[in-house]
């Protein structure tokens, strides 16, 4: 049976409220939406409110054949530094069109606006966070790094003093929703790249369809299983997912069919194992961590992620924290023994041989 955890139960409502904030905001009616994903994840994480996104005309581009998120799965992407000779790449247009299109629109933006023409709508800070999330997803798809200069020019623009706030909020969403970590890989030239979190090597993206990374949902489910005593029924998992707007049999705009992910993909990829509950009558089934999850990540890493979702520290879950510490110690000891194995075995063998030599 699943283990009850009072600390987890006490904070569960807080987790629901925070995850419910991760929704899509409608576009302002007076602004043409260039792509259905352009207002993705408009609400911020805890502490921020959602605002309508308004996109200035000189930022609007129709989705092209190279639109967001059509690439295949990648584990540790070999990022490329964008060539400056190609010009700045807009996330909604092909590379061959971007420099020309942006250049023409910048020139148009410098023209004098007649006095009777209203000012162009200005993108809010929330809107720029949304735009940056989409830009990050695009860069992850094409395996390219992002430069501070590109982010400033394409997205932040006149709000230079808000750069770090916009980057931090977008990075938090990438982490909590998509399971991707933003790292500054070149501190001198300020280039950033995206990596799958917690040591995992799966993002669930498919080459033949419009797709988003699924790692965030995988980490969340691994967390539910761990917090429930290292085993959870499907009903217990849906009890956590439903308040977040994720339902069995209902297509989700990020995760697709979540039940298919849970019962097929995550099990097939060996991140989860589906097994009968001992002594259950009628027979019932539960999920546990699969061999790939045990090999790639750890209970401590997952607990730290769960604690961050709660806005707390791993120590507020004492039983899970102690269990995670024990696992860390066991892994460290196993690593030491493995590294010292051959010499240790050799020494033991020599000692045994010496003890069998008859004394004269």
Curated annotation (Swiss-Prot):
A single GO cellular-component term on record: nucleus
Keyword Calcium listed: no
Bias-annotated ranges (Basic and acidic residues): 9-19
GO terms for biological process, alphabetical: negative regulation of transcription by RNA polymerase II
Name assigned to this protein: Melanoma-associated antigen B16
Biased composition (Polar residues): 63-98
Residues in MAGE domain copies: 125-324
InterPro entries: MAGE, MAGE_WH1, MAGE_WH2, MHD_dom
Compositionally biased intervals (Low complexity): 341-360
């Amino acid at each position: 049976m699943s283990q009850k955890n009072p600390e987890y139960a006490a904070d569960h409502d807080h987790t629901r409220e925070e995850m419910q904030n991760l929704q899509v905001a409608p576009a302002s009616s007076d602004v043409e939406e260039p792509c259905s994903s352009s207002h993705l994840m408009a609400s911020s994480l805890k502490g921020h409110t959602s605002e309508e996104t308004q996109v200035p005309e000189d930022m609007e581009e129709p989705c092209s054949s190279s639109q967001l998120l059509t690439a295949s799965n990648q584990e540790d992407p070999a990022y490329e530094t964008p060539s400056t000779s190609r010009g700045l790449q807009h996330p909604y247009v092909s590379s061959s069109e971007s420099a020309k299109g942006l250049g023409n629109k910048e020139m148009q933006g410098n023209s004098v606006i007649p006095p009777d023409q209203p000012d162009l709508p200005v993108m809010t800070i929330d809107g720029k966070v949304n735009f940056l999330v989409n830009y990050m997803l695009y860069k992850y798809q094409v395996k390219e790094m992002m430069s501070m200069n590109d982010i400033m020019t394409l997205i932040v623009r006149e709000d230079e003093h808000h750069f770090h706030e916009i980057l931090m909020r977008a990075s938090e969403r990438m982490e909590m929703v998509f399971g991707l970590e933003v790292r500054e890989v070149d501190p001198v030239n300020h280039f950033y790249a995206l990596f799958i979190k917690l040591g995992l090597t799966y993002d669930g993206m498919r080459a033949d369809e419009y797709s988003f990374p699924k790692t965030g949902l995988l980490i969340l489910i691994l967390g539910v299983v761990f917090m429930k005593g290292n085993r959870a029924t499907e009903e217990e998992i849906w009890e956590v997912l439903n308040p977040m707007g994720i339902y069995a049999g209902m297509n989700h705009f990020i995760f697709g069919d979540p039940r298919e992910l849970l019962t097929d993909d995550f099990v097939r990829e060996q991140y989860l194992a589906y097994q009968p509950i001992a002594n259950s009558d009628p027979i019932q089934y539960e999920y546990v961590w699969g061999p790939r999850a045990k090999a790639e990540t750890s209970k401590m890493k997952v607990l730290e992620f769960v604690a961050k979702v709660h806005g707390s520290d791993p120590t507020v879950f004492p039983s899970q924290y102690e269990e995670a510490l024990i696992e860390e110690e066991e892994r460290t000891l196993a690593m030491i023994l493995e590294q010292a194995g051959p010499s240790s075995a050799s020494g033991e063998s020599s000692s045994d041989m010496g003890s069998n030599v008859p004394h004269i």
